A protein has these predicted regions:
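Hydrophobic membrane-targeting alpha-helices
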Residues: 22, 26-31
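Peripheral interaction segments used for macromolecular assembly
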Residues: 2-18, 31-259
Length: 259
């Protein structure tokens, strides 16, 4: 699907301090409520060194490729197709959203299946679930979701909330578009695949073709844990912020990513 094609001949990262020890972020500048808000707390921000980070193509799968695949019941009967994937604040897959598409005699309905109850075929062409016509009412969309989680509470989120989002570099530099998410076989979000904007060029003036892979930065990287430091992404954010400057990605080569 993709392979690590980063250049091996690179100089020291501009982020050497944060890569080695992390940046201890304190005293966030923001609303007055930050001092007493339980969500405003000290956060240690660590950026992963892109020149040593590797994404093993044998250990992950593409969210985009799983969306739209057939969903089968325990006896191999058609149930519908994969409509969306739900992640938790911990970056792990929590549920699969299934569109019945008229199967099971329900018309067009969406069902939620716990990821622990889902089996993905080795070739990722279909998934098997426990859903049957008799058990369908067990898979309501809102089962297990609290009625009110509060405005600052961390929450589950849909893959479609991040795929298609804009990507910024440090300094609010416009950079790219989120193309895909890569999940480990254990169900943990590993990486974000991005497509640079046609107007984004490297330091030598060349333009960035192809796709690039970056570590996933979600809850715990600034957003939702304080004010004044915008790193990573939380559901509802206007864009996905990478903790890298333009100089930090100049030497990176594209991933061999198959659409």
């Amino acid at each position: 699907m993709f392979s690590n094609l980063h250049s091996s001949s690179v100089g020291p990262s501009v982020l050497s301090v944060s890569l080695a020890t992390g940046i201890l972020v304190t005293g966030f500048a923001g609303p007055a409520m930050a001092a007493t808000d339980p969500a405003a707390k000290t956060v240690e921000i660590k950026a992963i060194d892109l020149h040593t980070w590797k994404l093993d193509p044998a250990t992950g799968w593409s969210v985009r490729k799983l969306i739209g695949k057939k969903v089968k019941g325990p006896k191999g009967e058609n149930v519908g197709e994969v409509d969306n994937i739900i992640f938790g604040p911990d970056g792990k897959v929590h549920e699969l959203i299934v569109s019945t598409g008229g199967f099971l005699g329900l018309g067009e309905k969406n069902l939620a299946v716990k990821w622990a109850d889902v089996t993905v075929s080795p070739d990722y062409k279909f998934v098997t679930t426990p859903i049957t016509a008799a058990s369908v009412k067990k898979y309501g969309l809102f089962d297990g979701i609290p009625k009110s989680s509060g405005p600052l509470a961390e929450r589950d989120w849909r893959s479609s909330e991040l795929i298609g989002d804009y990507v910024y570099l440090k300094g609010n530099l416009h950079y790219a578009y989120v193309r895909d998410l890569i999940v480990s076989k254990g169900g943990e979000l590993q990486a974000v695949i991005v497509s640079p904007d046609v107007g984004f060029s490297h330091g030598d003036g060349s333009y960035s073709g192809g796709y690039y892979a970056y570590p996933y930065y979600g809850y715990g990287y600034g957003y939702g844990h304080g004010y004044g430091h915008e790193v990573g992404w939380n559901p509802g954010n206007a864009h996905y912020n990478l903790p890298y400057a333009k100089a930090d990605i100049t030497d990176l080569l594209p991933y061999a990513y198959r659409k």
